[in-house]
Amino acid sequence: KNGESMYVPAWMKKDSQKYFRAQKGTGERMNTISPFCDAAVEKDRAAFTKLMAHIREQDKGYGTVIAMQVENEIGLLGTERDYCGTAQERFAQEIPDELAEMYQVSGTWAEAFGEDAGEYFMAYAFASALERITSGGQQAYPLPCYTNAWLKQHPWYAGSYPSGGPVKEVHRIWKSAAPSLFALAPDIYVPYTAAVIEAYSYPGNPLFIPEVRKDAATASYCLYAFLKCHALCYSPFGIEDLGLQPEEVEKPRRRSWQP
C-alpha cells in the first residue's frame, strides 16, 4: 500500500530472508517486499484467489461488487529501482522480447532505456507480479480488475513517487505485462485534474478514477470526466465522512472562475 508493504502479515515481516525486501543502492533494506520475491508474489496470489472465491460465494445473485482493485498505489518509494541481489541479476540481463519489439531497442535495461531504465525495470517487475496475482483471482471469480497510480508530481523523479507504478509514461509496459487489468487508474490529488483525466482516458484504458480530492473545485470535474471522457467511476476519497450541510461546503472563490 502506497509504495510500502505495511499491511503484510506479521509472519511475513519477520521472515525477511524468505520474503526478501527491496534494497537501495547503498544496500539499505526497505519496507517494501521485492516484486522479484516469487514466494511473496505466490502468497499474494493465493490470498487474492481466496478473497475472490469468497466474494463469488457471498455475493452470488446480488452483484454488489462490480470491480476489484489489486494492490494500492504500488511502486517503490525512496529509490528508482530495487538493488537486491535478484534484482541486480535481472537488471543486467537483456530486456524481454516484447519490450524490445515495442520500443525498438535492444540490450540490457541500462543500454535500452538509459536514464529511464530503473523506472521501466520496476514497471515491468510490478506489472508482471500483478498479472500473476490478478489472473489467479479471476480464475476464481472473473470480476473486472484494475490497479491505481500515485501520480508523478514535484520533484518529478522516480522514487519521489512510487517508481514502477502505473504512471502514464509506463502504461505501454503495464498493458503488455498485465493484460488481465482492464484499467490503469489515477488517484488524483494534484491541481491539474483535467490533464490527468485526459491522460488516463484512451482506447484500451477506460477512465476509472477510484480516488480524487473531495473539495468543491474537484467536484466540478466529475462532469468533465463523465461527459467528455465517459468515465466508469469518479470517487471522491472519504466522501462518506464529509457529512456537511450544503451551506458548510467550501465554495470556489469567484475569481477562480474568471478567465
Per-region residue spans from a language model:
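Short catalytic/ligand-binding loop motif for oxyanion handling, primarily in non-cytosolic enzymes
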Residues: 2-4, 74-79, 154-157, 218, ...
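Catalytic-core region of carbohydrate-active enzymes that cleave or remodel glycosidic bonds
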Residues: 132-142, 169-259
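Short secondary-structure boundary/capping segments
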Residues: 7-8, 82-87, 91, 162, ...
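Polysaccharide-binding and catalytic clefts of secreted carbohydrate-active enzymes
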Residues: 13-171
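Short intrinsically disordered, low-complexity coil segments enriched in acidic
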Residues: 1-12
